[in-house]
Amino acid sequence: MADKSMEHDKKVLHSMGYAQELSRRMSGFSNFAISFSIICILAGGITAFPFAFSATGGAGIGIGWLVGGVFALIVSFAMGQIASSYPTAGGLYHWSSILGGRAWGWVTAWFNLLGLVFVISSVDAGVFQLFRDLVLKGVFHMDVSGAAWQATAGLPGMIWLAGVGVIIISHAALNHFGISLTTKLTDLSGYVIFAVAISLTLALLAFAPVAHLDFSRLWTFTNFTGDAGGGVMPQAKSILYAFVVGLLLVTYTITGYDASAHTSEETHDAQINVPKGMWQAVFYSMIFGYFMVCSFVLAMPDVKEGAAQGWNVIYWMMSSSTMPSPLLDLLYVGIVFANYLCGLACVTSCSRMMYAFARDDGLPFSKALSSVSVERRVPTVSIWVSAALAFLSCLYGGAFIVLAAGCAVFLYISYVMPVAAGIFAEGKTWIQKGPFDLGALSKPIAVLAVLGGLVLAWVGFQPPNQLVGYLVVGLSVFLIILWFASERTRFQGVPEGDRIKERQKMIADIEKKYND
């Protein structure tokens, strides 16, 4: 049965003009796990928690998480339907090219690729931040207050920079030399996230330093912008504006699920398992993440005092708990380990997208970036270039906040683009769908996905993240100029029509190297 499935997957890939170069080693659970790992509610749900809590207090969590989560789920359904039709490593870029044309696909590729690079940067910066605060400070009681440990507005502290660098290098090395181990670790991360999130939620509620749990906190709006929220968000007069901007918590956390698409060529029964892995990763993250972030609010000794902690609110809240020290230490280690595995999966996803764009000659040095190790069946050059770009983007001292918002904005723009193109292509150039077919709900869901995705992208460049907005505008202008100056005539795009037929001999020659 597995052989028939793999032959079918290979046949589908050939029909789109590509050879089976990557090892198809991933099960349906593995495909789910990579997106679930990158979403990692123990990453964004913790490090980005102040975005919402320091905006509108408990309601920003109790109501905001559900609002943002539902929109993310709608986007995942719309993306899943397209992924079922075109299961390639290029993912969004490939879909946009087929449904919206070469230029649309090329622009999508750049937003998606930069978003994925920023994901690695922000996640791995977050890993070090959590390791520093939870393990070194929380477990071993080390003094990590010195400038060398911090990411300042200028050049980051040397210990901070070295720590983030070591984490990124280790992720690249595992992806290069131990892809089988990487897959096992990514699968493990699914269980780790479930176990740690559930344990953390129950422990915080059981050992909350309050006489009784006040559930009204979860729907009580309080304007904590400005100094009241530790300066996380600039002062805002409108509570509605603050609430919408606070959705950045969900935008940053529930993102990166395009990883299921980028590993399509490594997944069994890709047309079925990729869309399922995508929407299930979002759904379970939304549900389990909701209980977890709500427990943060309920377990606080005082909401007003908690908001005043700003970025330190999670460490303050957990330190205030009455849970036994060994349990607290174990949870600290579990949180950091889950975040580390999240970063590992991020490198996998980014390198696959880079490889796919390069094999269509979309990048400088495409020949090298699209090369695949015959022995290991992984795009080795793309792995290390992804890691290098992620590290370089960390050289900006205030990296974490900007990169957190940047990755969310860039990714949601790239999510919206193929879905928007699909609205106009469906029933015209997009006739044959895969097994995951939304039927009559297809266009309504796509329209909601585009609107919701744009809102989630918009919140990412509101103050204090204006720099992200400038990046989006600057990149858009640069890409338009570059397209008309050279890429319009140079870049051929994804294989279509007669080009697919012409590539069949080349595909056969490529696959001979791998003894399939």
What are these regions (language model features)?
Residues 1-26, 422-444, 464-516:
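Terminal cytosolic tails of multi-pass membrane transporters
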